[in-house]
Swiss-Prot record:
The gene is Leo1. The modification Phosphotyrosine is found at Y607. One of its GO terms (cellular component) is fibrillar center. Its main location: nucleus. This is RNA polymerase-associated protein LEO1.
Length: 667
């Protein structure tokens, strides 16, 4: 270990002196790259000034931390470019050898971060940096470190490398272009490292590398051993108090760095998870995969701010401390939940099978002679079966008024004896018991069957049953005992429409219809007297209206006639014309006198041929009669009613004549 300290100590001091001389030029070039880099350098310088007032500066102990961090990040970027060209064997060798100085710089950079955090905690500034500030600081540090590590080259190469690093952040194509420049520097650094480190030290580093890869995390490489060596070299120079402060500051540093990582960096997340305590099997698998095939994501993860692996292992423990059991087994039982003797909740206990309860019972087996063929029969409403044997002593006839219902609630036809299948026991001549029935099934030559029940004949139809759902059971107390399974069913229909069963069925249907029908229609035996009465009343009313109409018309005609013949000689003939006219004059009194003596004679002479030779009085009378007849003919509606109206008119005329005579007598 002493040789390693001498080697690494001389290298660190030489690099610190060289980087101090070029820090001013590099900081100016970094400020031109962006405002974020200037802010980050300004914050680091402020923190260094505050740290100098409280305790001896870290620059005196370890040199310029910012320069070492820049070198470490630049070496990380070199690793990225080297691993992109991992197809050639020379690049793989340069990767392995270049990781040794870069890991030392990474460890020094992590200690620089710890010192900055320690100074920030001792000051009154309690606020943490946001994720954006952290990213800007990391970006500015990367640019600064890239420029400082390349100070041994010419100024043109420094500017070209700084531009290459900017293009690495923009796109992956720029990173591939800068890989050639990085390889030249890596070869230079490899030659210096080979000169300083002896073969014995390399063998010792390889042994320590194996031990650390088994204990810490799956991505262990030569970088880890070099970090550990650099830690061993720097530890004698640091006091115990500073170690305690660094170990205390490493805890928030780790948590802050974990918070700054984005979700897209899957490899970095896997590293952090392995540091926190992933399964040991997963770590071994990742180690084999990453040692065999180095990927770009691993190179990208190297550019992140490295963590102090030793401090992390001291704080959180190694991978061996993590149990490989599942989460469900390690969960403590919920408080208040009942726990069994083994410490497991009762819900997780396996349910014990409940023992079966068996009761042995002896039941006598009933053997019945069911015959060869079994048929399932659903009896129609016109058939019924009497299961008990027929006994004339206990036989009860059916009543007409009562309705007999079957087991399905249907009304059965009341055929009494004709539709009931019965059986009885009788003795033959020898005294043996014989079972007889009033029904039998006959099978004909064509395969059809018929049921003969007394004098009735029913057609029997056979059909198969679908499924084994119909069984024959017998009762054994409260239980049932299966006997057979039905495969075929039988249906019965009346043989003809002349049978008594068919007549009963039709009558029963008619009875049902008659019960529901409330109105009965009877044939008409004659005319309805009420209708005749109403018709006669209507006719009588029409006659009365016609008579009233005729009377009014006759009255009008008489009034018109009297107005035409009114004159002084007509009304008072004796006063004016007694001497002049004599018998030829027409007067009202003369007319009345003629009506008194010979009304009938006047009526007979109206149509006589002697009317032309008569006097003027006869002409006047004939004219009056003709007018009356014309008026009567116009008022009649039918030929039959004309005669009746004429008779009534004559009668009424007579009445008016009589009234006129009475008026004359009064005069």
């Amino acid at each position: 270990m002493a040789d390693m300290e001498d080697l690494f100590g001389s290298e660190a001091e030489s690099e610190a002196e060289r980087k101090d001389s070029e820090s001013e030029s590099d900081s100016d070039s970094d400020q031109d790259n962006g405002a974020s880099g200037s802010n980050a350098s300004g914050s680091e310088s402020d923190q260094d000034d505050r740290g100098d007032s409280g305790q001896p500066s870290n620059k005196e102990l370890f040199g310029d931390d910012s320069e070492e961090e820049g070198a470490s990040h630049h070496s990380g970027s070199d690793n990225h470019s080297e691993r992109s060209d991992n197809r050639s064997e020379a690049s793989e060798r340069s990767d392995h050898e270049d990781n040794e100085p870069s890991d030392e710089d990474q460890h020094s950079g992590s200690e620089a971060h710890n010192d900055d955090d320690d100074e920030g905690h001792r000051s009154d500034e309690g606020s943490r940096h946001s994720e954006a500030e952290g990213s800007e600081k990391a970006q500015s540090d990367d640019e600064k470190w890239d420029g400082e590590d390349k100070s041994d080259q010419s100024d043109d190469e420094k500017l070209q490398n700084s531009d290459d690093e900017d293009r690495e952040q923009g796109s992956d194509e720029d990173k591939l272009q800068n890989s050639d420049d990085d390889e030249e520097k890596m070869q230079n650094t490899d030659d210096e490292d080979r000169a300083q480190i002896s073969d014995d030290d390399r063998q010792q580093l390889s042994e320590e590398e194996k031990g650390n890869s088994d204990d810490e995390h799956p991505v262990a490489s030569d970088n880890d051993e070099e970090k550990q060596n650099s830690d061993d070299e720097d530890q004698p120079q640091v006091s115990d108090e500073e170690k305690m402060q660094n170990s205390d500051d490493e805890r928030p540093q780790v948590s802050d760095e974990d918070g700054r990582r984005s979700d897209g960096e899957e490899e970095q997340d896997q590293k952090s998870e392995s540091a926190r305590g992933s399964d040991s099997e997963d770590e071994v698998l990742r180690l084999k995969r990453k040692n065999a095939i180095p990927s770009d994501s691993e190179a990208d993860s190297d550019t992140e701010v490295p963590k102090d692996n030793n401090g992390t292992m001291d704080l959180f423990g190694g991978a061996d401390d993590i149990s490989s059991g599942s989460d469900g087994e390690d969960k403590p039982p919920t408080p208040g939940q009942p726990v069994d003797e083994n410490g497991l909740p009762q819900d997780q206990q396996e349910e014990e099978p409940i023992p079966e309860t068996r009761i042995e019972v002896e039941i006598p087996k009933v053997n019945t002679d069911l015959g060869n063929d079994l048929y399932f029969v659903k009896l129609p409403n016109f058939l019924s079966v009497e299961p008990r044997p027929f006994d004339p002593q206990y036989y009860e006839d059916e009543f007409e008024d009562e309705e007999m219902l079957d087991e399905e609630g249907r009304t059965r036809l009341k055929l009494k004896v004709e539709n009931t299948i019965r059986w009885r026991i009788r003795r033959d001549e020898e005294g043996n018991e014989i079972k007889e029935s009033n029904a039998r099934i006959v099978k004909w030559s064509d395969g059809s069957m018929s049921l003969h029940l007394g004098n009735e004949v029913f057609d029997v139809y056979k059909a198969p049953l679908q499924g084994d759902h119909n069984h024959l059971f017998i009762r054994q107390g409260t239980g049932l005992q299966g006997q057979a399974v039905f495969k075929t069913k039988l249906t019965f229909r009346p043989h003809s429409t002349d049978s008594a069963t068919h007549r009963k069925m039709t009558l029963s249907l008619a009875d049902r219809c008659s019960k529901t029908q409330k109105i009965r229609i009877l044939p008409m035996a004659g005319r309805d007297p009420e209708c005749q009465r109403t018709e006669m009343i209507k006719k009588e009313e029409e006659r009365l209206r016609a008579s009233i109409r005729r009377e009014s018309q006759q009255r009008r005609m008489r009034e018109k006639q009297h107005q035409r013949g009114l004159s002084a000689s007509y009304l008072e003939p004796d006063r004016y014309d007694e001497e002049e006219e004599g018998e030829e004059s027409v007067s009202l009194a003369a007319i009345k006198n003629r009506y008194k003596g010979g009304i009938r004679e006047e009526r007979a002479r109206i149509y006589s041929s002697d009317s032309d030779e008569g006097s003027e009085e006869d002409k006047a009378q004939r004219l009056l009669k003709a007018k009356k007849l014309n008026s009567d003919e116009e008022g009649e509606s039918s030929g039959k009613r004309k005669a009746e109206d004429d008779d009534k008119a004559n009668k009424k005329h007579k009445k008016y004549v009589i009234s006129d005579e009475e008026e004359e007598e009064d005069d």
